[in-house]
């Protein structure tokens, strides 16, 4: 994990829904102790999957009798959340959610339904892989119908859109290549501008697909639902993926800069159960701040104007983080 990169983009906390549990512990403890530089980690272990796993190395749960061991590990390693994955059966997912909730751990999923009926707390990605072979959130043209909006809004499930990994990052790169004119890009990943080309003849269709997809988060917010920021890094570069995601949600989805900023700070903290500690500027809160030259409420691109970041009261300049 490149903690210095995240801090240079103003990221002071990370919610990581899947990963090696022991690596997560090492990162969380080393950063928490000050031995390693980086954002605080809200993490978990590998995604919990069915007997025919989607990715290698994840726990396989073929029946409810296998659930207690995985939940016990989650408790002992102090997971902040659990992610149920693509090939976990609906019945086993329901039992995982029930068991996780019994020890106070929230559960997220790739699917909206039946996860919402099973009591899941969140859903990842506007699309997302599924054992059903299709998304339960958007059509093949990336359109979402009102039943999707209603389920998200009424249930209170969080939605982490990650529209960048479905073409929005590339569209931002085409429409606004100045996003790469940044010393953080040239210092940390100078190759970031490569490979993100959309042929002119495909640009209108690509734009329409992204706009269809990006409209979902705005509609969820308008109907009282909960959007939290996420990127599915490292599919796109750390930090850069966040500011491009924020820009895409405003430019292509029509979200207000204020809603995007709140989804990145206070609402995200509340969704993790830490709204009383981080995510807002109030007396008694942990001192996490970013200092910008411009106002992101007027133009979301202003998040690029970061000059200083404060994490837990420690003030760091972007300039020193680059070296």
Describe every region a protein language model picked out.
Residues 309:
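Short aromatic-centered micro-motifs
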Residues 11, 103-105, 157, 225, ...:
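Short glycine/serine/threonine/alanine-rich loop segments
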Residues 10, 41, 78, 100, ...:
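Divalent metal-coordination and catalytic microenvironments
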Residues 237-240, 255-261, 271-306:
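Acidic, glycine-enriched loop/beta-strand segments at the rims
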Residues 48-64, 129-140, 197-206:
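Acidic/histidine-rich helix-loop elements
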Residues 1-109, 114-122, 126, 144-187:
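Divalent-metal coordination cores built from histidine and acidic residues
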Residues 70-88, 134-253:
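Active-site neighborhoods of metal-dependent hydrolases
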């Amino acid at each position: 994990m490149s903690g210095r990169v995240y801090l240079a983009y103003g990221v002071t906390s990370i919610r990581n829904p899947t990963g090696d549990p022991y690596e997560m512990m090492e990162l969380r403890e080393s950063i928490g102790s000050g031995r390693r530089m980086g954002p605080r980690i809200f993490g978990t272990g590998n995604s919990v999957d069915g007997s025919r796993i989607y990715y290698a190395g994840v726990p396989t749960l073929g029946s409810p009798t296998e659930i207690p061991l995985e939940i016990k590990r989650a408790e002992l390693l102090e997971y902040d959340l659990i992610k149920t994955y693509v090939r976990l059966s609906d019945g086993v997912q329901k039992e995982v959610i029930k068991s996780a909730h019994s020890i106070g751990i929230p559960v997220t999923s790739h699917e909206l339904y039946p996860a919402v009926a099973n009591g899941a707390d969140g859903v990842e990605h506007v699309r997302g892989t599924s054992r059903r072979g299709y998304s339960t959130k958007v059509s093949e043209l990336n359109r979402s119908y009102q039943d999707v909006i209603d389920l998200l809004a009424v249930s209170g499930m969080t939605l982490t859109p990650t529209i960048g990994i479905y073409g929005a990052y590339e569209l931002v790169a085409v429409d606004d290549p100045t996003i790469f004119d940044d010393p953080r890009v040239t210092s940390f990943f100078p190759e970031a501008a490569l490979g993100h080309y959309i042929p002119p003849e495909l640009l209108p269709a690509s734009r329409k697909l992204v706009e269809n997809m990006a409209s979902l988060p705005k509609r969820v917010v308008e109907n009282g639902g909960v959007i939290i920021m996420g990127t599915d890094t490292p599919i796109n570069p750390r930090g850069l993926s966040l500011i491009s995601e924020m820009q895409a949600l405003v430019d292509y989805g029509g979200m207000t800069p204020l809603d995007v900023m709140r989804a990145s700070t206070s609402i995200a903290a509340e969704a993790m159960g830490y709204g009383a500690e981080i995510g807002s500027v109030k007396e008694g809160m942990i001192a996490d701040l970013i200092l910008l030259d411009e106002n992101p409420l007027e133009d979301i691109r202003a998040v690029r104007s970061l000059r200083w970041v404060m994490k837990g009261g420690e003030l760091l300049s972007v300039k020193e983080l680059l070296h």
